[in-house]
Amino acid sequence: SDVCSSDLPNSEYWFGTDNLGRDYWCQVWYATQVSIRLALIVAVGESILGVIIGLIWGYVRKLDRFFTELYNLIDNVPYIIYMTLIALVVGQSFTIMAVSMIAIGWLVMARRVRNMVFMFRDREYNLASRCLGTPLWRVLTKNILPYLVSVIILRMALSIPATINLESTLSYLGIGLGIETPSLGLILSKVRGFFLDYPYLLVFPASIVSIISISFYIMGNAFSDAADPRNHV
């Protein structure tokens, strides 16, 4: 079936309707909520895992080679291959996608934290703490972690739009969220045959993703600057 002229965006249907006559605004609204919820869960999950691994990776010299090799092993395989294998072997659902993204997405945060830890690891106060026998967890959480808060916040803010874009791409390709879960990628996949005749079917979801990306980037920079101890000296 095709979309008739009365189904174009109007006062009753703000985003028009799809090829089946369903309100496109409602679909995009619910799909956006699902995508944001997924992105927040993934951002928090991969940040917690990445920060813990990154702190240990950067501070404990004996484990540096192990984590470096693990990073290279995982990072050298394209992300989409992991997600395709997971979708085929494990299945497709909100929970599976969230866990999968966290299991792979911690790499970027861990690498960033590890590089920052290198800058503070051999400072005088950390050397003194080691000489005094201060527990490892206390050195990491009290002497190093406060200086990384701004980097962590910024990375989390950038992770949210990146996750939304990735989820949309995977769902559009059929290897993302299941068909029972509304998502931006799934919506675009269903109406892709009508993009040329009715470009609003593509423009509206793409605009939503762009607004979300810009908003979280601006907020992330603002919170990052506010949390940076160097800005309060």
Role assignments for model-derived ranges:
Residues 14, 18, 58-59, 63-120:
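Generic hydrophobic transmembrane alpha-helix motif, especially the helices
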Residues 22-37, 62-64, 68, 121-122, ...:
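Amphipathic cytosolic juxtamembrane alpha-helices at the membrane-cytosol interface
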Residues 1-5:
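Short, small-residue-biased leader/transition segments that mark boundaries at the very start
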Residues 24-59, 212:
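Transmembrane alpha-helix signature in integral membrane proteins
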Residues 42-43, 51, 88, 92-142, ...:
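Membrane-cytosol interface at the C-terminal ends of specific transmembrane alpha-helices
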Residues 48-52, 60, 76-82, 93-94, ...:
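Transmembrane alpha-helices and adjacent helix-loop boundaries
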Residues 87-90, 117, 165-208:
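Glycine-rich helix-loop "coupling/hinge" segments at transmembrane-helix boundaries
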Residues 61, 94, 103-104, 150, ...:
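C-terminal transmembrane helix and the adjacent membrane-cytosol boundary/short C-terminal tail
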